[in-house]
Amino acid sequence: MAADWLGSIVSINCGNTLGVYQGCVSAVDRINQTISLSQPFHNGVKCLVPEVTFRAGDISELKILEIPSESLKYTSDQLNDHSTGFGYLPTRQQNGTGKQKQTVAHNSAQNIPGQEEGKASEPSSTSPQPCSKSFVDRHNEAVNQPKNFRRRHNSLGSSSSRYPNQVTPKKSGTKNGQLKARDDECFGDELEEIPDTDFDFEGNLALFDKAAVFEEIDTHERRGGGGTRSRGTPNERPPTYRHDENILESEPIVYRKIVVPQSGGQEYCTDSGLVVPSISYVLHKKLLCVAEKHGLSVERRLEMSGVCASQMALTLLGGPNRLNPKNVHQRPTVALLCGPHVKGAQGISCGRHLANYDVDIILFLPNFVKMLEPVTNELNLFCQTQGKQVSSVKDLPECPVDLVINCLDCNENAFLCDQPWYRAAVDWANHNRAPVLNIDPPVGDHVQGIHAKWSLELGLPLALGEQAGRIYLCDIGIPQKVFREVGISYHSPFGCKFVIPLHSM
């Protein structure tokens, strides 16, 4: 009757040490109380040996998963009569009572092809391995896998091939044997066919219409009353605001906030787009006279213009990159060309402030028997600095300086252009190859001998010519009512600065 169980698929539980084995019954030895399984699986992993043999003492539980078709003619009563056959194998004794546990498993619904019968068997066993999937699940995966699928073998599952005749594997006594066994574990498995074609991610992604899916989701949410979520085009998204933006609607921007009674012939605009019209020299002079009458004296105006001009000059010299304690060995040098008038006094005030910032100042001022009081006062203050004063062009440096500040020209003293010292100073500035900054240059009708790169205007700009270079405007502190008194509707274009650039319109 033992031969009737050949070809059956069984599951043998050998306890926690040896694990669970599944396979097809290939031999049953009633005398030696052994059973052999062909094509065995250990804890769901296929063994590398073709056949394993178990003793009855090692078996804790035996389940019959499938009976071959020729054995289905036996009824359950017949199976009970043949209890001495393979269906009821004795298990290990428990608690020393000598009683043995007998278990019969129900037939599985899986249709697994039968194995060959009548194979010779030798007693052997494999080493324990970690528990995994059942034999039936593992077999179904193997059937459903494509031909080019490459199985990844577990290195622990291949340990049984090294000890075919032992239940518990023994370590090799030599070190070289251990290394060789490890190499066999890692590289000994035969490589199966590797798929040649790679997965087409781009082509697969092109088949997915995200916009249509999002639209379907939004439509479903609208019908369900759950509200809408913006996933589509940016036009459908609700407006977002930064932390410094106002969510309230503001009034329209007015760019022309300065209105003059008579245009000077040219208009400028700031970086923010505000329009700054130019005024005539007569209106500019009237504005300064009214401001002086209200308390903005010449000394205050000289101080404000000197501070603004020095700030602009420090920026042109390089700012903090040039003026820092690490660059004491390369202090910038500035040449001041000043005339004997109020505009020259503005340049002297600028030189005094620059000298306080460790800038080497060379002041050129021609000798006059009598000078204006503002010029004398500013010159006395300048002499208290480390700046150098010269009265001859020959004493000016021959090598290029970092910056030249021009305050030679004046509308009231046009005759100074014919003086020899003036012509010599103009020739020196044009040949020094240093950039030139004009402070409060005269109106465009006055011919300027020095070609400037920048020009700084006070209060409101004049209509300057092309030789003035880029135009800048500084605030000298004229009150708004003073502008209104001379007929100018004024709104400050400076923002948070004292000096701003102007662009021609």
Swiss-Prot record:
One of its GO terms (molecular function) is mRNA binding. Pfam families: Edc3_linker (PF16598), FDF (PF09532), LSM14 (PF12701), YjeF_N (PF03853). Residues 1-79 are annotated as: Required for P-body targeting and interaction with DCP1A. Its main location: cytoplasm. Residues 187-223 form the DFDF domain. Residues 186-293 are annotated as: Required for interaction with DDX6. Keywords: Cytoplasm, RNA-binding. GO terms for biological process: deadenylation-independent decapping of nuclear-transcribed mRNA; P-body assembly. The keyword Cytoplasm applies. Residues 84-181, 219-243 are annotated as: Disordered. GO terms for cellular component: P-body. Residues 1-68 form the Sm domain. It is found in: Cytoplasm, P-body. SUPFAM superfamilies: YjeF N-terminal domain-like. Residues 91-113, 122-132, 155-177 have a biased composition (Polar residues). Residues 280-484 form the YjeF N-terminal domain. Belongs to the EDC3 family. Binds single-stranded RNA. Involved in the process of mRNA degradation and in the positive regulation of mRNA decapping. The DFDF domain is unstructured by itself. It assumes a helical fold upon interaction with other proteins. This is Enhancer of mRNA-decapping protein 3. It comes from Xenopus laevis.
